[in-house]
Structure formats: C-alpha cells, structure tokens
Amino acid sequence: MASAASVTSLADEVNCPICQGTLREPVTIDCGHNFCRACLTRYCEIPGPDLEESPTCPLCKEPFRPGSFRPNWQLANVVENIERLQLVSTLGLGEEDVCQEHGEKIYFFCEDDEMQLCVVCREAGEHATHTMRFLEDAAAPYREQIHKCLKRLRKEREETQEIQSRENKRMQVLLTQVSTKRQQVISEFAHLRKFLEEQQSILLAQLESLDGDILKQRDEFDLLIAGESCRFSALIEELEEKNERPARELLTDIRSTLIRCETRKCRKPVAVSPELGQRIRDFPQQALPLQREMKMFLEKLCFELDYEPAHISLDPQTSHPKLLLSEDHQRAQFSYKWQNSPDNPQRFDRATCVLAHTGITGGRHTWVVSIDLAHGGSCTVGVVSEDVQRKGELRLRPEEGVWAVRLAWGFVSALGSFPTRLTLKEQPWQVRVSLDYEVGWVTFTNAVTREPIYTFTASFTRKVIPFFGLWGRGSSFFLSS
C-alpha cells in the first residue's frame, strides 16, 4: 500500500496552477499545460491590454486560442485514483498506523518517551538507548489497568445508583412527611379559624346583648322621664292657672295646693343601671385571655418561621458622641466623655442611640443583641423608620416611628404609646429581635430561654433600620446573627 507521504506527493502533482486545488474537469491547451475547465474559462474572460491578442498560458506565457483547450480524460482518471488513495490512506490509519514523518508502519512503543515509533524512528539516535516494546506487548499492562479501572468504576457506578435509589426513597419519605405536616398545618389553622370564629360569635353575641339591654334601659328611662315631665308640667299649669284667679278663688284650698307642689320632687332616675355598667366594664376582661393566648401564639410562631439572619453592623455616621463603637462596628459602649464626631445630619445629637448600617425593606430577618448592664444603666433595642428624628428629643413610641423595648436591672418595658412594664420569668440579657416586614411584626424574645418578651404590630411602608440605645456608665451591647 502506498505510504501517506507518497500519496500526498502525488496529490501535489495534480493541482491546478490557477486555483491551487485538485484539478476538476482538467483540460489541456496548446502548450500542453493542464488547468481546471472553470478556472481556465474565467481566466480567458479577463480582458488583456490588447483586446485582439490571444490569451497566454498562465505558466509559460505561450499564446493559445480560447476555444482550443481539450478535455484530458486520462488526467481526470488519475486525479480520481489519487483521491481514492487519499481516502484509503486516511481510513486505514486505524488498522495500519503509519508514521507521519517516515510513512512507515508503526510497530514499536518507546516506554521512556511514551511514543509510538516505526522502524526508522527506533533506529534514530534519540531512541537508541530507550526501552522498546512491540505495541501489543506495551498495551497489555495498560489493558490490565483499564480492566481494573473499569471494574472499580462499574462498582462506583453501582454504588452511586444505589445511593441515588436510597436517597430518592428518603426524599420521597421526606416529601410525604412534608405533605402530612402541610395537611396538619391546614387542619390546625382551620381549627384555629373555627375556634376564633366561635369566640368572635360568643363575644359579639355578648356585645349584642349589651346593646339590647342598653336600648331597653334607654327606652325605660325615656318613658320614666316623659312621665315625670308630664307630672311637673301639670303642676306648673295648675299653679299658673291658680295665680291668674281672683284673690278669693286663689285663697281657696291654697295651702294644700302649695304643700302638694313643694313635696313633689324629681326622682332623678339613671339611664344605665349599675349592674349594666359593671357588665360593660367587665367585658374587656373577658377578651383578655384570648388576646394573651393569641399574643403568645404569635411570639412563639416566630421561632418556627424561617427568618433570615441579618448580618448587621453599626453605622458610625449615626452614633451619638457618647457611644464608643468597636473597630468592627459590632459593639457599642456608653461613655460620659464626648467623642470628637462631626455633627452630620444622620447623627443623633440628644438621644444616645445608634442605627445599623443598612435598612430593611422586605422579608423576615432576625438578629441577637447581647446586653451588659453590670454597672447599671439601660439598653434599648428595636427598629425605627428611616425618617426617625435625629436632632433634638426623640420620643420612643410607634407614633414617632420607633418600635422598641428597654431593658434595665430588674425590669423590661415595652415602649408603646405609653410605656408598659412587662412581667417575665427571667431577666433577658440576650434579646432576639425578629422582623417580618410584610406581616408587620416586630417580636422580641429571650434568645436563651425563648421566652416571649413583646410583639409590636405595625404596617410598614418605608425602610426600617435596626435601632439601639444605651444609657449609664459602662453599659454596652454587641451584635450577633
């Protein structure tokens, strides 16, 4: 079989001088040179300097007649055979590998250089001292390694498939559990809704009863007052008529008339009976247990919901000059010594407070504040609206855009419209603040015991920012997620 180098050499001999590609429909002109028919036709169509002169051969410049070129069938057959040899040479490399450099069949493998060599390559100086093996002999240990790798990989694949099957079953079990829990949640909330609707019906029925009793007593009161008014009107009319009579008629039975008028007193009835008033006053107390239970339910629910840990840091641009911030902006300490801080618009100048660096505009977020009041003082934690007052006195209540609690030795206060002192089982020193922006919850819990502290409900429409305040020498806090 012809070597690849020989076939390549033959192919070069049947290239068209014009397009440099393999001859297609080769034709011969008068001088004996061969060209592609299409290439020569286009060449003849190019006008020369003298339109009447015959075109010249692109190789030897001999003139020829444009219509004189003849098909070269023998050359066409040669071109076809060479192309077949090229195809066979290319396809045969898988069965009979040929050295690209020498065109000889490859028989050997150099283990030093990991190269496949022909006889000529083996005798070359660079491989003369290397370890040579026949291809099959050299391939044998590699085949053994391949068999071992295949065995190991097949085993790994089986184990992977077993893991996949096992984990799919496990995930299916988990999906079933989630589905069951989903149904439980739906069922429990359906029961809760039913319970709340029943309680609502009971309370509304009681209020309806109070409405009816009030209206009944109002009607009775109006009727009584109307009777009293009529009796007084009759006496007034009698006295006015008596006063208009002559003296003899006026003096007739005057004493009994005056006694009757003087002894007539207004009974001064009350519109609402004391018993009904007490029922009205007692009604809010009947709703308080339900309110407390719902409040505890909401606060405990915060631990079950998926809150994203808020990685917050303190903003030194907002810090009051009496607050010392750590370099990592995770800790603050109260000091009576004023810091040399610029009076920028963001800074609190009266309230010893500081805000977090970034605000919150949506989602559920939670963070923990660890408080140290070993030397007294107090600490305030919560959230504020981004437009909270920074200059002058700051009133800590929801109407001013502040939702916070204050902790001091021995007590905790919820800073609502009116501060409320809270009753807790244990003084919290680590407070978890949980914010649900969309629902409008700001919940405070003891981060250690999970005891609910307080929950604010609000309707947020703008950015809110974590808020912290300190008062008292040595009081401090630090943040964690």
Swiss-Prot record:
Gene Ontology, cellular component aspect: cytoplasm
Per its database record, what is this protein's job?
E3 ligase that plays an essential role in the differentiation and survival of terminal erythroid cells. May directly bind to PTEN and promote its ubiquitination, resulting in its proteasomal degradation and activation of hypertrophic signaling. In addition, plays a role in immune response regulation by repressing the phosphorylation of STAT1 and STAT2 in the interferon/JAK/STAT signaling pathway independent of its E3 ligase activity. Mechanistically, interacts with the intracellular domain of IFNAR1 and thereby inhibits the association of TYK2 and IFNAR1.
- List the coiled-coil residues: 142-177
Gene name for this UniProt entry: TRIM10
Is Chaperone set as a keyword in this record? Answer: no
Q: Source species, please?
A: Pan troglodytes
Q: Which GO terms describe its biological process?
A: innate immune response
Q: What is this protein called?
A: Tripartite motif-containing protein 10
Subunit structure of this chain's protein: Interacts with IFNAR1; this interaction prevents association of IFNAR1 with TYK2.
Annotated Zn(2+) binding lies at C99, H102, C121, H127
Is Zinc-finger given among the entry's keywords?
yes
Identify the main location: cytoplasm
List the InterPro entries: B30.2/SPRY, B30.2/SPRY_sf, Butyrophylin_SPRY, ConA-like_dom_sf, PRY, SPRY_dom, TRIM/RBCC, TRIM10_RING-HC
One GO MF term on file is:
ubiquitin protein ligase activity
